[in-house]
Amino acid sequence: MFNTLKILDLPENERPRERLIKYGSQALSNSELIAIILGTGGRNENVLSLSSRILKQCEGLNGLLTLTPEEIMTLKGIGSAKAAKIIAVGELAKRFKAYKSGDVYIIKSPGDVAGLVMEEMKYFKEEHLRVIMLNTKNIVISCKDVSIGSLNSAIVHPREVFCEALKKNSASIVICHNHPSGDPTPSSEDINVTKRLKQCGIILGINLLDHLIIGHSNYISLKEKNIL
């Protein structure tokens, strides 16, 4: 018979929860924090050992938190419940870093746009087109993904891009999309779609300020490249 080993099975001075309360979260390693999230180990493996192993398999925290639920569940000792906990923590971390609730986020440069979306979008495995809506003072009103898949004029329709902006009474928008390859160099289709959306924005009275292409470690602003 197999046993699922719990945190309480560990000596008290090795239990991550007790160590967190006594010494603070900063004193804990990534594997100890993951152990608290998981709560229990696997078959004949305590939760600290499980956490250390999956972090090693994923080459660290970034690798683990960018996996899909299906990919996480291929790891030995991780079922749907544990996978859901890991995915939830990763999503909360991305949302907290990207845009804190209640904050006023002002777009003054392409770097400001990258700071808002890059941490999340650089890990997407499919292309996402995101619209950032701004008021007259360039304060972010809302963000919305309007397309998932290849960015081309046949798929990306101005109606989807500008519909939400009109509802929000946006003065202007910035669009962003990621290249799963990691190379943010714009394709000819990227440029054509951008120019088409720019013209539609002029007609609707909503200025397209910039289009950022997000790579794994950098981004390209079509405005800075004088393409827009």
From Swiss-Prot:
GO terms for molecular function: metal ion binding; metallopeptidase activity. InterPro entries: MPN, RadC_JAB, RuvA_2-like, UPF0758, UPF0758_CS, UPF0758_N. The keyword Metal-binding applies. Residues 106-228 form the MPN domain. Zn(2+) binds at residues 177, 179, 190. Gene3D superfamilies: Cytidine Deaminase, domain 2. A motif (JAMM motif) lies at residues 177-190. It holds the Pfam family RadC. It comes from the Bacteria. Keywords: Hydrolase, Metal-binding, Metalloprotease, Protease, Zinc. One of its GO terms (biological process) is proteolysis. Belongs to the UPF0758 family. This is UPF0758 protein NT01CX_1687. It comes from Clostridium novyi (strain NT).
